[in-house]
Amino acid sequence: MRPRPTRVRASTITAIPRAGAVTPVASPCPFCNPDPGRVLFEDGLVRVLSDGFPVSPGHTLVVPVRHVASFFETTPAEQTAVLAALAEARRRVDTQHRPDGYNVGLNDGPAAGQTVLHCHVHLIPRYAGDRPDPRGGVRWVLPEKAAYWDRDDP
Protein backbone atom coordinates (compact mmCIF):
# COMPACT_ATOMS: atom_id res chain seq x y z
CA MET A 1 0.00 0.00 0.00
CA ARG A 2 1.48 3.34 -1.05
CA PRO A 3 1.36 6.23 1.42
CA ARG A 4 -1.15 8.90 0.51
CA PRO A 5 0.30 12.29 -0.40
CA THR A 6 -0.09 15.07 2.09
CA ARG A 7 -2.14 18.01 0.89
CA VAL A 8 -0.14 21.19 1.21
CA ARG A 9 -1.72 24.62 1.18
CA ALA A 10 0.35 27.79 1.28
CA SER A 11 -0.52 30.19 4.05
CA THR A 12 0.88 33.50 5.17
CA ILE A 13 2.88 33.82 8.35
CA THR A 14 5.33 36.46 9.42
CA ALA A 15 9.06 36.14 9.71
CA ILE A 16 11.55 38.67 11.06
CA PRO A 17 14.58 38.56 8.75
CA ARG A 18 16.28 41.64 10.25
CA ALA A 19 15.68 43.80 13.29
CA GLY A 20 12.27 45.41 13.12
CA ALA A 21 11.36 44.26 9.59
CA VAL A 22 8.34 41.97 9.21
CA THR A 23 7.98 40.17 5.88
CA PRO A 24 5.18 37.76 4.92
CA VAL A 25 6.48 34.38 3.80
CA ALA A 26 4.71 31.37 2.32
CA SER A 27 4.27 28.46 4.70
CA PRO A 28 3.58 24.98 3.36
CA CYS A 29 2.05 23.96 6.72
CA PRO A 30 -1.61 23.00 6.20
CA PHE A 31 -2.40 23.54 9.90
CA CYS A 32 -1.06 27.10 10.31
CA ASN A 33 -3.78 28.62 8.13
CA PRO A 34 -6.21 25.79 7.36
CA ASP A 35 -9.11 25.84 4.94
CA PRO A 36 -11.89 27.54 6.95
CA GLY A 37 -14.29 24.79 5.88
CA ARG A 38 -12.25 22.26 7.87
CA VAL A 39 -12.18 24.28 11.13
CA LEU A 40 -14.74 22.83 13.54
CA PHE A 41 -13.87 25.10 16.47
CA GLU A 42 -10.92 26.86 18.06
CA ASP A 43 -9.76 28.91 20.99
CA GLY A 44 -6.59 30.91 21.46
CA LEU A 45 -4.32 27.89 21.88
CA VAL A 46 -5.80 25.08 19.78
CA ARG A 47 -7.99 24.49 16.76
CA VAL A 48 -9.98 21.41 15.87
CA LEU A 49 -10.15 20.38 12.22
CA SER A 50 -11.85 17.70 10.20
CA ASP A 51 -9.14 15.41 8.81
CA GLY A 52 -8.31 15.93 5.13
CA PHE A 53 -7.93 12.16 4.62
CA PRO A 54 -10.38 10.67 7.14
CA VAL A 55 -9.92 7.08 8.26
CA SER A 56 -13.58 6.96 9.30
CA PRO A 57 -16.57 9.33 9.50
CA GLY A 58 -15.85 11.97 12.14
CA HIS A 59 -12.02 11.66 12.02
CA THR A 60 -10.86 14.86 13.70
CA LEU A 61 -7.53 16.57 14.41
CA VAL A 62 -6.67 18.66 17.47
CA VAL A 63 -3.85 21.06 16.59
CA PRO A 64 -1.98 23.68 18.64
CA VAL A 65 -2.40 27.09 16.96
CA ARG A 66 1.30 27.83 17.47
CA HIS A 67 3.46 26.06 14.90
CA VAL A 68 5.35 23.45 16.87
CA ALA A 69 6.43 20.09 15.44
CA SER A 70 6.45 17.93 18.56
CA PHE A 71 3.95 17.44 21.35
CA PHE A 72 6.94 17.50 23.68
CA GLU A 73 7.69 21.08 22.61
CA THR A 74 4.21 22.32 23.58
CA THR A 75 3.71 24.33 26.73
CA PRO A 76 1.76 22.98 29.70
CA ALA A 77 -1.06 25.39 28.78
CA GLU A 78 -1.14 24.05 25.21
CA GLN A 79 -1.16 20.46 26.48
CA THR A 80 -4.11 21.24 28.74
CA ALA A 81 -5.91 22.97 25.87
CA VAL A 82 -5.27 19.98 23.55
CA LEU A 83 -6.81 17.57 26.08
CA ALA A 84 -9.81 19.84 26.71
CA ALA A 85 -10.39 20.23 22.95
CA LEU A 86 -10.05 16.47 22.49
CA ALA A 87 -12.83 15.92 25.04
CA GLU A 88 -15.06 18.52 23.36
CA ALA A 89 -14.36 17.04 19.92
CA ARG A 90 -15.36 13.62 21.25
CA ARG A 91 -18.66 15.02 22.55
CA ARG A 92 -19.40 16.53 19.15
CA VAL A 93 -18.44 13.39 17.22
CA ASP A 94 -20.56 11.28 19.61
CA THR A 95 -23.58 13.47 18.85
CA GLN A 96 -23.12 13.51 15.08
CA HIS A 97 -21.71 10.04 14.31
CA ARG A 98 -22.45 7.80 17.33
CA PRO A 99 -19.29 5.65 17.09
CA ASP A 100 -18.74 2.53 19.18
CA GLY A 101 -15.20 3.47 20.25
CA TYR A 102 -12.21 5.67 19.49
CA ASN A 103 -8.53 5.56 18.69
CA VAL A 104 -6.60 8.61 19.88
CA GLY A 105 -3.23 8.90 18.18
CA LEU A 106 -0.17 11.10 18.00
CA ASN A 107 2.72 10.45 15.61
CA ASP A 108 5.67 12.42 16.99
CA GLY A 109 8.53 12.66 14.50
CA PRO A 110 9.08 11.20 11.03
CA ALA A 111 10.28 7.86 12.48
CA ALA A 112 6.88 7.56 14.18
CA GLY A 113 5.02 8.28 10.94
CA GLN A 114 4.45 12.03 11.33
CA THR A 115 3.99 13.45 7.81
CA VAL A 116 2.94 17.01 8.69
CA LEU A 117 5.54 18.47 11.04
CA HIS A 118 3.03 20.46 13.08
CA CYS A 119 1.88 18.70 16.24
CA HIS A 120 -1.59 17.19 15.86
CA VAL A 121 -3.63 14.59 17.72
CA HIS A 122 -5.97 12.29 15.79
CA LEU A 123 -9.41 11.44 17.18
CA ILE A 124 -10.53 8.48 15.07
CA PRO A 125 -14.06 7.18 15.63
CA ARG A 126 -14.37 3.40 15.42
CA TYR A 127 -17.45 1.43 14.51
CA ALA A 128 -18.36 -2.17 15.38
CA GLY A 129 -17.35 -4.31 12.41
CA ASP A 130 -15.08 -1.73 10.74
CA ARG A 131 -12.26 -4.28 11.20
CA PRO A 132 -12.69 -8.03 11.57
CA ASP A 133 -10.46 -8.03 14.68
CA PRO A 134 -9.58 -4.61 16.10
CA ARG A 135 -7.44 -6.02 18.92
CA GLY A 136 -3.92 -4.66 19.02
CA GLY A 137 -4.89 -1.18 17.80
CA VAL A 138 -1.74 0.92 17.54
CA ARG A 139 0.42 -2.18 17.89
CA TRP A 140 -0.23 -2.87 14.19
CA VAL A 141 2.25 -0.07 13.44
CA LEU A 142 4.83 -2.84 14.01
CA PRO A 143 3.00 -5.94 12.72
CA GLU A 144 5.40 -8.39 14.36
CA LYS A 145 4.42 -6.89 17.75
CA ALA A 146 0.68 -6.69 17.12
CA ALA A 147 -0.85 -10.06 17.97
CA TYR A 148 0.82 -10.35 21.38
CA TRP A 149 -2.13 -12.41 22.68
CA ASP A 150 -1.18 -15.26 20.29
CA ARG A 151 2.46 -15.50 21.39
CA ASP A 152 3.79 -17.99 23.91
CA ASP A 153 6.66 -15.78 25.08
CA PRO A 154 6.12 -13.55 28.14
Segment roles from a protein language model:
Residues 2, 8-154:
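HIT superfamily nucleotide-processing domains
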